[in-house]
């Protein structure tokens, strides 16, 4: 109103809280005689548009991927010409101030802005895309795009990426398109099932434990399992964590410590610079075995073998755990087998993975049988 605006243009917000906020903002604007115009969304295909033959949303990724590709998407928006900006009132400087608590960020953030995002995209295409399919699971290798924060905040649109990838048939390019589709899939699922933001899409009613001192050890990277601790320390120090390690750390919390996934998802969101609500919640549910397209409940990530497989030389572990920097090669994943493994203060394991795996499977099996029994009684 201060600048005489007649219309306010935004992109469509599809996450539950943002969508509710937009309804309130639209009502307030219209009451003031200002039109609210929502155009587009931060997705190649706006959530809710890809539907199955029955008109419903998909709950399994592979058929969604096929339908998403068939649906297609528009090309990137044409860059506008010179824009005439409104003259701001004299006291408008306060509009763009940043709260001091937010300005004093404890981590180093990636360069901001579209120019930086496009530069990173060009660098990824030229250096890492061809090997993306083989390197994306290796946390010690700079093999991922690191574009997630730019996508999250709308600095870069997925249609720009997809347009640049059109016609590229290599394994790396195709895998990258598939990973973009996972982001679209999770947003679509959340659109159709907003309650899945903080609760199980497919409830199993597993007997979980309340967060305790072991949960704090997990949050701080003091579990005694190197790959888990390296990931959690990377998260705290950089605001980012490698996707493979996100799965390993999530499995450890839900299957080894038996803590319900929303506790971990909340911790991730508090620290991730790319904290996407849909991808975060449904990624956690995939690991926990209670979401859409979920991993089978009996799949329990072994934090030792996962570390040895995806960080075979221990480089990632040594990078984030200085207490293990003296251990060469794969020995960094098993400090308990090395005479001086604990010489620099690395903590001992807080649980026995083998025993907790058995316990997790027993809890999930009891939940499965209980659900089956209830279903039979309802027949």
Whereabouts are the PLM-identified features?
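Glycine/tryptophan-enriched, flexible segments
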Residues: 55-204, 310-311, 315-379
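Active-site-proximal binding-pocket segments
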Residues: 138, 142-321
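Short coil/turn segments at secondary-structure junctions
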Residues: 9, 215, 344-347
């Amino acid at each position: 109103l201060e600048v005489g605006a007649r219309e306010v243009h935004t992109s469509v917000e599809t996450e539950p809280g943002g969508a509710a906020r937009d309804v309130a903002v639209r009502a307030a604007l219209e009451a003031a005689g200002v039109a609210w115009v929502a155009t587009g969304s931060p997705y190649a295909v706006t959530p809710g548009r890809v539907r199955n033959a029955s008109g419903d949303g998909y709950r399994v990724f592979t058929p969604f991927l096929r339908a998403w590709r068939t649906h297609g998407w528009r090309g990137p928006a044409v860059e506008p010409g010179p824009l005439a900006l409104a003259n701001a009132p004299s006291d408008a400087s306060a509009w763009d101030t940043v709260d001091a608590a937010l300005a004093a960020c404890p981590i180093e953030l990636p360069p901001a802005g579209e120019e930086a995002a496009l530069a990173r995209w060009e660098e990824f295409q030229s250096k890492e895309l061809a090997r993306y399919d083989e390197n994306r699971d290796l946390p010690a290798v700079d093999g991922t795009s690191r574009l997630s924060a730019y996508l999250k905040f709308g600095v870069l649109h997925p249609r720009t990426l997809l347009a640049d990838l059109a016609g590229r048939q290599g394994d790396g390019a195709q895998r990258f398109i598939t990973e973009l589709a996972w982001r679209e899939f999770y947003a679509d699922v959340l659109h159709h099932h907003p309650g899945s933001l903080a609760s199980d899409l497919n409830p199993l009613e597993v007997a979980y434990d309340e967060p305790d001192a072991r949960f704090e050890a997990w949050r701080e990277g003091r579990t005694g399992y190197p790959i888990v601790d390296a990931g959690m320390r990377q998260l705290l120090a950089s605001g980012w964590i490698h996707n493979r390690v996100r799965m390993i750390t999530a499995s450890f919390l839900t299957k080894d410590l038996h803590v319900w996934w929303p506790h971990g998802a909340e911790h991730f969101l508090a620290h991730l610079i790319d904290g996407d609500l849909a991808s975060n919640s449904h990624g956690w549910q995939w690991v926990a075995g209670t979401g859409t397209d979920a991993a089978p409940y009996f799949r329990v990530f072994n934090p030792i073998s996962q570390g040895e497989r995806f960080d075979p030389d221990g480089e990632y572990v040594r990078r984030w755990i200085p207490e293990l920097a003296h251990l060469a090669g794969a020995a960094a994943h098993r400090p308990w087998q090395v005479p001086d493994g604990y010489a620099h203060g690395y903590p001992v394991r807080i649980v026995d993975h083998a025993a907790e795996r058995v316990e997790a499977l027993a809890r999930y099996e009891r939940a499965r049988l209980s659900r089956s029994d209830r279903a039979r009684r309802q027949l």
